[in-house]
Amino acid sequence: MSRSRQPPLVTGISPNEGIPWTKVTIRGENLGTGPTDLIGLTICGHNCLLTAEWMSASKIVCRVGQAKNDKGDIIVTTKSGGKGTSTVSFKLLKPEKIGILDQSAVWVDEMNYYDMRTDRNKGIPPLSLRPANPLGIEIEKCKLPQKNLEVLFHGMSADFTSENFSAAWYLIENHSTTSFEQLKMAVTNLKRQANKKSEGSLAYVKGGLSTFFEAQDALSAIHQKLEADGTEKVEGSMTQKLENVLNRASNTADTLFQEVLGRKDKADSTRNALNVLQRFKFLFNLPLNIKRNIQKGDYDVVINDYEKAKSLFGKTEVQVFKKYYAEVEAGIEDLRELLLKKLLETPSTLHDQKRYIRYLSDLHAPGDPAWQCIGAQHKWTLKLMQDCKEGHMKSLKGHPGPHSPMLDLDNDVRPSVLGHLSQTASLKRGSSFQSGRDDTWRYKTPHRVAFVEKLTKLVLSQLPNFWKLWISYVNGSLFSETAEKSGQSERSKNVRQRQNDFKKMIQEVMHSLVKLIRGALLPLSLREGDGRQYGGWEVQAELSGQWLAHVIQTIRLTYESLTALEIPNDMLQIIQDLILDLRIRCIMVTLQHTAEEIKRLAEKEDWVVDNEGLTSLPCQFEQSIVHSLQSLKGVVDCKPGEASVFQQPKTQEEVCQLCINIMQVFIYCLEQLSTKPDADIDTTHLSVDVSSPDLFGSIHEDFSLTSEQRLLIVLSNCCYLERHTFLNIAEHFEKHNFQGIEKITQVSMASLKELDQRLFENYIELKADPIVGSLEPGIYAGYFDWKDCLPPAGVRNYLKEALVNIIAVHAEVFTISKELVPRVLARVVEAVSEELSRLMQCVSSFSRNGALQARLEICALRDTVAIYLTSESRSSFKQALEALPQLASGADKKSLEELLNKFKSSMHLQLTCFQAASPAVMKT
């Protein structure tokens, strides 16, 4: 047997020495978890468990027993830790012997305590009693260890009445500190006592000497007289003479007392006749007495009288006796019928059932009343279960709302499962996103849940007594000893024949219990023929996952209670199958309800953005799933004997699909939020990162979210979901032993990425298209012609406007989420560079000034957004530059450089946002 605790260790005992029955306190570690855990305690090899009092895991109080060893360890043994060890020992001292005349606070067993050869005082004068202090001086007990004295005087004793008396040991033990002068006085006292004793004994003998002589003379005279009479030959020997005398005396006595002896014989015969009449009186009065005792319920008296009458008159041939005995048998037959009727009455306690069966057994009732009782109890249990269902259905029709069930069973054989309601894992659903409807579910029990509670309570109130009745029937304890001996072989045969019948009874009760619960909670799992008998509930709404988890806990407790009765597991397997189906159903319902809750999360989006550009929506989504999984922990975890809910591939697939559906529902919520009309958005509590620089002024409280800002917020949430939330949820699924996690993650990630890309493209389209569309009109504003233009004086306004628009996009994105800036600006720059490249390639020819102007503007744009360039945008800029003629002279190059520096200097403040460090990898 495996133990969960360390072995006991005794580290101290107080006191550490003493005589037997000394009260000691034992201290140590791991001395047991309670009084029932302590199963052994020995001190010096003696078992002291009977006197042990467990105080705590580190303290035990007990009394030392009559140990054989003088010194030994203190060994504590517990169920949880086994046999322990000791670092200390106890020394057992020999108790001082209490003298015959000494006062004592306890009773002394003198038969075992004193040596009767030396301590007896019957028939001898008081002077012969040995004094407690023979030396006559004060006794001072020695403090030397007893063990040392025993080693020093091996085989000797300090008891002066012992044959091995040692005077030296006696003096050391009682007079170790006595002075020499006192010892001299002690010798004088000892001599004086010896002389007094001798004188007293001699005087006693002298006083009774004359009595001894008189007795001797009388005995001698009797002996001589007998010898003289025996030698005479008068009428034979002395014995013959004595015989004749005795015979004459006898004859004379007969003559004298003949009349008296006659009267004695007559009195004896009269007495015998009266005794016989008294014996018959018992039989004559017995029928009336039987009726009276039956009315009073004194069945034991009736049975005893019947057994007595049966033994006296059962085989009589006297007609009068036969008549009265027949009346007795008729009364007993009525009693048998009455007892059988009471036995089969329901409800009845197990005690009464056993009592009636024993009475019927003593009365040798025909048939097998015990088996009849078992059958009646079985039918009664089935009827109660069906009545329970019908009663709740009537109550449901009369009161369709939830109610508090009235469990009217008096004897509850298990703790009420309502106490476990607050302990089921599902009840931790107190998050902020739950509505008030969940706050009252504890106090309103649905009818079907109340029915299951009452049904299981009913079964547990009936089945234990039913099972115990069968066990008593099997082992014969229902019957009296006489009935057991007379019908043992027949009953053994009946038990063997009825084992299968009883097994069918138990299975019928289990099947009825399971089908009634299935009819209430899982009606679709019933067969077509069982629907009317066990189903028929008017289901208005599906039970929530919390209530299903509570029902599972109720049935689990029922299963544990039935297992404790030692009912075979094969009879209870059907309950395990029910628990498995309910666990699967609970998981399905909980996940479906979770999907519905998550669908409503869109209504709770407050658009409050934290420093990372996130709203509370991803956190609420994760909390919702975590709470659902926590509520399912007790359901998913397997109790002893239970199978995993994911053992069937079909169940795995369904649960996996429900989990995927939950993730996709949330993704759909995000999509809804991104396309929600502006009028439906509440932005009164819009918040941004206070540390984010706002290039265009502060965002006020009455600022209204635009569709672009909503897209950015949703995109920011999508990024967080992909990097954190979905991975965390996958870990939670794995922690709770869910299957198909990889598939759930892959499908969810794919859907999320698809939404993210679609929303991103929408945002880029909203922001990049206006900028791209403004390039061509800006380039050719004022009838600008690349072939005929003035020398460049700087970057034209159209490019500055494009940069300002890009800066505005940067500011908008940066305000929501810093991490989205590289991704968004890279795509905007790609679109602008691609359009610029197209426009340059569409120009047929450039003048010298036109080529310089175009190169200036292309380089200015490229250098400004250099940190957001991608391979596509670099390629576009390269193609645009390749479409231009090469600079003709060094003067043009110098002019280009001067103009670029002038542009960067003049727009230094505006271009600062493009100088921040960007992540190395930009997602597009």
Curated annotation (Swiss-Prot):
The protein's matches in CDD domains, at most eight in alphabetical order, are given as: IPT_PCSR
Tell me where in or outside the cell this protein is found.
Midbody, Midbody ring
- Identify residues that carry Phosphothreonine: 440
Which residues are annotated as modified residue N6-acetyllysine in the UniProt record?
A: 454
Q: Where is the IPT/TIG domain?
A: 8-93
Q: How does it assemble?
A: The exocyst complex is composed of EXOC1, EXOC2, EXOC3, EXOC4, EXOC5, EXOC6, EXOC7 and EXOC8. Interacts with EXOC3L1. Interacts with GNEFR/DELGEF; this interaction occurs only in the presence of magnesium or manganese and is stimulated by dCTP or GTP. Interacts with RALA and RALB. Interacts with ARL13B; regulates ARL13B localization to the cilium membrane.
Name assigned to this protein: Exocyst complex component 2
Question: What organism does this protein naturally occur in?
Answer: Mus musculus
Q: What is the lineage of its organism?
A: Eukaryota, Metazoa, Chordata, Craniata, Vertebrata
